[in-house]
């Protein structure tokens, strides 16, 4: 573990750990400034996914402590998977760090996953390489197909039954070859402060989230023929729709979402959308300002010959814009 000191301001603790399963050789995702013990190999795949569920359960503790958690599963073929977890804790007392993370590793040990010697160290906050992103992702996210969902606090109620269902969905998704990433953080209205949750445009679902779950197709898709892309998108969309069914009142983080997100007004903006649409119409009655799936964009679309989603092409009027759904 690293506790990164920001003199006179905050300390940021960072803990990284790995566990793997499967018969294949393992390539560990690269870390940035986070020392860790050697990865623990888990012989039984079911135990690997139980350990994943243990991390998901603990993620709320990270959020409640004001921290930020990464918990990513990367398939590496032939039934081989790597999990990497990282916890960062701003403004957390250095002498309390071990007390905080010990329950996580105790719970893992109880199911037979013993992480050797989790420990922490101190590094200057500004030291080169001390980023908080623990994993590099080859290539650009721009050429990857990915879809996301915000996982709300309610999933951690009722003894975690619904959270177990989320873990099962993510397992099935990873077993199809998708990379499943989670980002645990809590941008609640209380944490954010002014302007709060009434006049801001932030999706209300983000104020109630514990995890932002993003699922990637690992191979680039920007070179795929349109029909193949459509099939790949439908396949991944079907997986994420399982999470949507488990979180019907939640939504999606606009900046890391499906370019073809269905019901995007509600997914991206939630109950704020009617108010935001009124503002857009007041300040831009000419519809001069436009971007894909942003507030008030229903009346226009970029049309490409191959039918693929793009923002490079002619901007055309939508013949039958579904405006009535959100009219004040």
Q: How should these model regions be labeled?
A:
Residues 1-328:
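Soluble FAD-dependent oxygen oxidases
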């Amino acid at each position: 573990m690293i506790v990164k000191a920001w003199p006179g301001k905050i300390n940021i603790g960072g803990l990284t750990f790995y566990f793997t399963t499967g018969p294949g050789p393992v390539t560990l995702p690269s870390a940035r400034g986070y020392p860790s013990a050697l990865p623990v190999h888990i012989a039984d795949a079911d135990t690997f996914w139980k350990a994943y569920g243990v991390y998901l359960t603990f993620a709320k503790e990270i959020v409640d402590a004001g921290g930020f958690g990464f918990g990513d599963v990367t398939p590496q073929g032939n039934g081989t998977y790597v999990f990497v977890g990282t916890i960062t804790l701003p403004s957390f007392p250095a002498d309390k760090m071990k007390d905080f993370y010990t329950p996580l590793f105790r719970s893992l040990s109880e199911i037979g996953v013993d992480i050797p010697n989790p420990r922490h160290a101190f590094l200057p906050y500004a030291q080169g390489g001390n980023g908080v992103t623990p994993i590099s992702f080859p290539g650009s996210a721009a050429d990857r197909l990915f879809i996301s969902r915000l996982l709300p606090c309610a999933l951690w109620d009722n003894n975690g039954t619904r959270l177990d269902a989320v873990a099962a969905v993510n397992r099935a998704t990873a077993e199809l070859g998708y990379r499943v990433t989670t980002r645990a953080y809590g941008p609640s209205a209380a944490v954010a402060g002014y302007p709060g949750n009434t006049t801001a445009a932030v999706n209300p679902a983000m104020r109630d989230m514990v995890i932002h779950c993003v699922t990637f197709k690992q191979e680039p898709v920007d070179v795929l023929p349109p029909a193949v892309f459509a099939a790949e998108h439908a396949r991944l969309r079907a997986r994420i729709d399982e999470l949507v069914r488990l979180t019907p009142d939640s939504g999606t983080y606009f900046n890391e979402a499906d370019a073809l997100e269905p019901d995007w007004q509600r997914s991206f903006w939630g109950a704020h959308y009617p108010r935001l649409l009124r503002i857009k119409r007041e300040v831009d009655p000419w519809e001069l300002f436009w971007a894909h799936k942003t507030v008030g964009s229903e009346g226009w679309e970029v049309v490409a010959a191959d039918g693929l989603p793009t923002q490079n092409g002619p901007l055309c009027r939508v013949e039958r814009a579904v405006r009535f759904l959100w009219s004040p």
